[in-house]
Design a protein with these regions (language model features):
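Juxtamembrane helix-boundary/capping and inter-helix hinge elements in multi-pass membrane proteins
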Residues: 76-78, 157-162, 172-174, 214-216, ...
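Feature of multi-pass inner-membrane transport and sensor proteins
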Residues: 34, 161, 176, 214-220, ...
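Short alpha-helical segment immediately N-terminal to, or the first helix within
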Residues: 36-37, 155-156, 180, 210-213, ...
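Membrane-water interface segments at the C-terminal ends of transmembrane alpha-helices
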Residues: 1-32, 41-157, 185-206, 210-212, ...
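Glycine-rich helix-loop "coupling/hinge" segments at transmembrane-helix boundaries
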Residues: 104, 206-231
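Glycine/proline-centered hinge or cleavage motifs at structural transition points of membrane proteins
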Residues: 170-171, 184
Length: 258
């Protein structure tokens, strides 16, 4: 009975998604250019940059998200509920809206540059952020900080604060009690949040294309370029397989950590 209920959806996916995908991949794999040295170099370069920017984005997100998670979990202050809710808004915004917002704030004719130009009597924008690695990292942190706040914050709120108090009674200061008691208990949730953020950054497309441009080509951006601009299906197929395998590996690792 359940299979009958799912049959139309499975048929639709098979006919309009999986079949075209398999045919396109087959066209690329059958080509002699699929594993040509040039194709492998493009794949290695895009994979290397994808891993690098995802790692940097993840570390910056943890740097901001972990203190914020501790603040929301351990302290009560006016507007806490509203502020915590607002941290989730970026995660729900479309990429185009975020890119437009960054351009309005940090672009060459954005609010920040125009303000500095008026204050300092400058003729050219003093700050260049868009179409740089910094713009990509800022956008990823903007998007994904809420993941760390919620995953780690929820785990922290479930911990008994008396554990820290007991450690301090036994002679440890607040910093030592955190590292020896709280951090080991939070380690699984921190690793889970870090891996989830890394996965989102690894598969990021719109942010990198709109704020970084083609010069910062991750695997997904390179697939877009090779397919639509270069019409190079063999390289696109190779990159798609690499992306699929990496995403599958990260997803399995994340599921094992839950």
């Amino acid at each position: 009975m359940r299979l009958k209920n799912w049959a139309p959806a499975l048929l639709f996916l098979g006919l309009f998604f999986f079949y075209p995908l398999v045919k396109i991949l087959a066209l690329g794999v059958d080509s002699p250019e699929f594993l040509a040295p040039e194709s492998l170099k493009i794949a290695a370069d895009s994979l290397g940059f994808t891993l690098w920017q995802a790692l940097l984005s993840m570390l910056l997100t943890l740097l901001i998200g972990l203190p914020a998670a501790y603040l929301f979990a351990r302290y009560d202050f006016r507007g806490k509920t509203l502020l915590r809710a607002l941290t989730a808004v970026p995660f729900m915004l479309p990429t185009v809206v975020v890119a437009a917002g960054f351009n309005a704030l940090l672009g060459a004719r954005g609010w920040l540059n125009l303000t500095l130009m008026n204050l300092l009597n400058l003729e050219t924008p003093p700050i260049t952020v868009l179409y740089t690695l910094g713009a990509i990292l800022l956008a990823h942190v903007f998007y994904n900080t809420t993941i760390v706040i919620r995953v780690v914050g929820n785990a922290l709120s479930r911990l008994d604060p008396r554990l820290n108090e007991a450690a301090r009674i036994l002679g440890g200061n607040r910093w030592k009690a955190f590292w020896q008691v709280t951090f080991p208990l939070l380690r699984p949730s921190i690793f889970a949040a870090a891996l989830l953020v890394f996965l989102f950054d690894f598969t990021s497309f719109g942010v990198i294309l709109l704020l970084g441009g083609p010069s910062f080509a991750t695997i997904e951006v390179e697939i877009y370029i090779q397919t639509l601009s270069m019409l190079n299906l063999p390289v696109a197929a190779l990159l798609s397989i690499i992306q699929l395998l990496c995403t599958l590996a990260f997803s399995i690792l994340y599921s094992r950590m839950l």
